[in-house]
């Protein structure tokens, strides 16, 4: 027991405290790269059958995902050079761009399966909803820094204004329709307001209102009602509304403890729809088994915990904007992972959300890579402040 305790403490210490002389969090970089590599491998495996059928090229989606990955890494390298102050001062412009893109996609967007969520850009289809998530969280972080006292003191002045901004975004998103993104944004927004010190009574009242609104949005659309009913009992109509979920559950069952082996999934052979996108986790469960998916989930939630630690460090160094944004990114990644995994496992209705840094999709991969890059930038600026304080202290001691 003592040995286990020592290993646990050493592992936690290594995870929480990266080398003090480094200018960035190396552990966060390795975690993100491991998730991206896992995504490339699993997209290659899961997309093999559909690539062969649609393009006669079994590695078509692998090449596209690899291209997205290179774009994501290149974009992240550029974003890493941008100071936090620039993000804060230009947050309203980013939000304006997100609004414009959401309007464009409703007018000239590409429709897939009845949903108009993509703007064709040649190399890939841009999904404005992904841009809107990050833009809202950056804007909210700046707002909470400017209006922190109002958020804590008044209901309309500080609390309802950001909800109104979210409401405008939500209306455009529901026009696509994209309820899943709306729910992710709402939960993350609630979390950021709670961290900012919003009154618990107001927070709970708004949460009840939010849940009521989501339930109402489900009830007014027959296809959403079918999704919920099929999620509650997919075996009632296994070849109709419950088909995707029953195939996903069979993939989980076949995986058992150690999986069928990489590339050996049966469900991806035209049985499980969206095997390389929304339901890539089911293919992972079948091929890698319970042990494999637990390790991958541990990686994702390691990234989430890293975001929380970075946010805490930012608040300690008086980087309020960075603190709110780091916590927002952490909540976003955590909740979206829970929804994606829950949908694949039959615990929540399907929402069409990607598994962070793993699922196929250029917009999601690039935007989430940018979010990780911003986390690295927040940590970097905290380290620069610490190094500056340490240098000042050493100078004072010499004097």
From Swiss-Prot:
- Report keywords, A-Z: Cell cycle, Cell division, Cell inner membrane, Cell membrane, Cell shape, Cell wall biogenesis/degradation, Glycosyltransferase, Membrane, Peptidoglycan synthesis, Transferase, Transmembrane, Transmembrane helix
Q: Name one GO biological process term.
A: peptidoglycan biosynthetic process
Please provide, alphabetically and separated by semicolons, the GO molecular function terms listed in this UniProt record.
lipid-linked peptidoglycan transporter activity; peptidoglycan glycosyltransferase activity
Catalyzed reactions: [GlcNAc-(1->4)-Mur2Ac(oyl-L-Ala-gamma-D-Glu-L-Lys-D-Ala-D-Ala)](n)-di-trans,octa-cis-undecaprenyl diphosphate + beta-D-GlcNAc-(1->4)-Mur2Ac(oyl-L-Ala-gamma-D-Glu-L-Lys-D-Ala-D-Ala)-di-trans,octa-cis-undecaprenyl diphosphate = [GlcNAc-(1->4)-Mur2Ac(oyl-L-Ala-gamma-D-Glu-L-Lys-D-Ala-D-Ala)](n+1)-di-trans,octa-cis-undecaprenyl diphosphate + di-trans,octa-cis-undecaprenyl diphosphate + H(+)
Ranges per topology, Periplasmic: 49-64, 113-118, 176-177, 221-289, 342-354
Topology class, membrane: Multi-pass membrane protein
Q: What is its EC number?
A: 2.4.99.28
- Residues assigned to the Cytoplasmic compartment are 1-27, 86-91, 140-154, 199, 311-320, 376-399
Q: Where in the cell is it found?
A: Cell inner membrane
Q: In which pathway does it act?
A: Cell wall biogenesis; peptidoglycan biosynthesis
Q: Which GO terms describe its cellular component?
A: cell division site; plasma membrane
Task: Indicate the family of this protein.
Answer: Belongs to the SEDS family. FtsW subfamily.
* Protein name per UniProt: Probable peptidoglycan glycosyltransferase FtsW
Source organism per entry reads Vibrio vulnificus (strain YJ016)
């Amino acid at each position: 027991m003592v040995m286990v305790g020592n290993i646990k403490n050493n592992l936690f210490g290594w995870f929480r405290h990266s080398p003090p002389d480094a200018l960035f969090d190396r552990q966060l970089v390795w975690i993100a790269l491991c998730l991206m590599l896992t995504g490339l491998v699993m997209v290659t495996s899961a997309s093999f059958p559909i690539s062969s059928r649609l393009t006669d090229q079994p590695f078509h989606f692998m090449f596209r995902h690899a291209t997205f990955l290179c774009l994501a890494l290149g974009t992240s390298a550029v974003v890493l050079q941008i100071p936090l102050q620039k993000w804060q001062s230009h947050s309203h412009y980013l939000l304006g761009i997100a609004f414009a893109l959401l309007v464009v996609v409703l007018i000239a967007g590409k429709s897939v399966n009845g949903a108009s969520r993509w703007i064709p850009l040649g190399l890939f289809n841009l999904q404005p909803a992904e841009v809107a998530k990050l833009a809202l969280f950056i804007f909210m972080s700046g707002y909470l820094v400017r209006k922190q006292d109002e958020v804590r003191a008044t209901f309309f002045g500080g609390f309802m204004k950001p909800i109104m901004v979210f409401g405008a975004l939500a209306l455009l998103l529901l026009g696509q329709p994209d309820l899943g993104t709306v729910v992710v944004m709402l939960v993350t927004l609630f979390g950021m307001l709670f961290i900012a010190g919003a009154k618990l009574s107001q927070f709970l009242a708004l949460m009840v209102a939010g849940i009521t609104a989501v339930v109402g949005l489900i009830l007014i659309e027959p296809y959403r009602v079918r999704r919920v009913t099929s999620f509650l009992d997919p075996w009632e109509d296994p070849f109709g509304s419950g088909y995707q979920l029953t195939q996903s559950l069979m993939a989980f069952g076949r995986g058992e403890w150690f999986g069928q082996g990489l590339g050996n999934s049966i469900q991806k052979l035209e049985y499980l729809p969206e095997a390389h996108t929304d339901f890539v986790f089911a293919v992972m469960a079948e091929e890698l088994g319970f042990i494999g998916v637990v390790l991958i989930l541990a990686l994702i939630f390691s990234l989430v915990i890293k975001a929380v630690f970075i946010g805490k460090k930012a608040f300690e160094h008086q980087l309020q904007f960075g603190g709110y944004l780091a916590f927002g990114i952490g909540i976003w990644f955590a909740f979206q992972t829970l929804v994606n995994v829950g949908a694949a496992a039959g615990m929540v209705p399907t929402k069409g959300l990607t598994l962070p840094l793993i699922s196929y999709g250029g917009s999601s991969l690039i935007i989430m890579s940018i979010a990780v890059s911003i986390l690295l930038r927040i940590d970097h600026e905290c380290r620069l402040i610490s190094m500056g304080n340490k240098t000042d202290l050493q100078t004072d001691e010499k004097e």
